[in-house]
Design a protein with these regions (language model features):
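N-terminal juxtamembrane cytosolic/stromal segments of multi-pass membrane proteins
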Residues: 1-50, 56-57
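Membrane-interface segments at transmembrane-helix boundaries
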Residues: 4, 81-106, 172, 179
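Alpha-helical transmembrane segments and their helix-start/interface "positive-inside/aromatic belt" motifs
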Residues: 14-32, 99-109, 184-191
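Membrane-helix interfacial "entry" motifs
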Residues: 17, 21, 54-66, 70, ...
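Hydrophobic alpha-helical membrane-insertion segments
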Residues: 27-37, 106-123
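Transmembrane helix-loop junctions in multipass membrane proteins, especially transporters and channels
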Residues: 41-53, 90-95, 124-135, 179
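Selective recognition of hydrophobic, aromatic-rich stretches within alpha-helical transmembrane segments
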Residues: 63-86, 113, 120-193
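Juxtamembrane boundary at the C-terminal end of a transmembrane helix
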Residues: 199-204
């Protein structure tokens, strides 16, 4: 039986007949966007709650801007990953359609979405026990992060590492199956693509 997603068996999933689905790709990417917005909204809610010197601002007004920024960020990440996967496999002699690469790239983001949801769930446990009195929003964010328990920081890093390995696995075996390329070369392209995810997220 063909699996309904490539999260656990990408080779079998992409061995099915039929064209890739841009609708599926957009849906999975949207889930990643929702995860990002949820995490940032929860993070800012707690940040506003403990920061006593923040300028008066409406959290309800900031969240829509955050959703827009996250939407642009997710779109950029998706396009970058697709470009890297497709470009490198083409240079390495692979075939396969760009449409298929878009779907494959999106499913990797699905793995990251699970990690982001997990990070959102741990945010309440990172809240400082005392109020933060800094006035600069950047300093407030630094203090907020510094107060997080070491165990939570370790869990966050491990979750990101697992999501990255999972995404590389999905991209590698999906590209090898659909683009007529060796697993080794597909893995090289996937690892390069995975490097860009935390880099882009760090910029934003």
């Amino acid at each position: 039986m063909v699996p309904t997603t490539p999260l656990f068996d990408p080779e079998e999933y992409f061995s099915r007949e039929g064209d890739a689905s841009l609708t599926t790709a957009i849906t999975v990417t949207a889930v990643f966007w929702i995860a990002m917005v949820a995490y940032m909204s929860i993070y800012m809610w707690y940040l506003f709650d403990v920061a006593t010197e923040l300028p008066e601002a409406s959290l309800g007004g900031i969240i829509p801007l955050t959703a827009l920024l996250m939407g642009l960020t997710v779109l950029l990440i998706w396009l970058l990953i697709t470009t890297i996967l497709h470009g490198i496999t083409r240079v390495a002699g692979g075939s396969g359609s760009l449409k298929t690469t878009f779907e494959i790239a999106a499913w990797g983001l699905g793995a990251y979405a699970i990690a982001v949801f997990a990070q959102a769930a741990t945010t309440p446990f990172t809240v400082p026990s005392e109020s933060i009195t800094a006035e600069d929003p950047a300093d407030i964010a630094v203090q907020f992060a510094a107060e997080a328990p070491l165990s939570i920081a370790i869990i966050t890093l491990l979750t990101l590492a697992v999501a990255t390995v999972w995404a590389v696995y999905i991209w590698t075996y999906s590209m090898a199956q659909t683009h007529d390329i060796s697993v080794r070369r597909a893995a090289a392209a996937s690892i390069i693509a995975a490097v860009f995810v935390p880099l882009v997220l760090g910029v934003f």
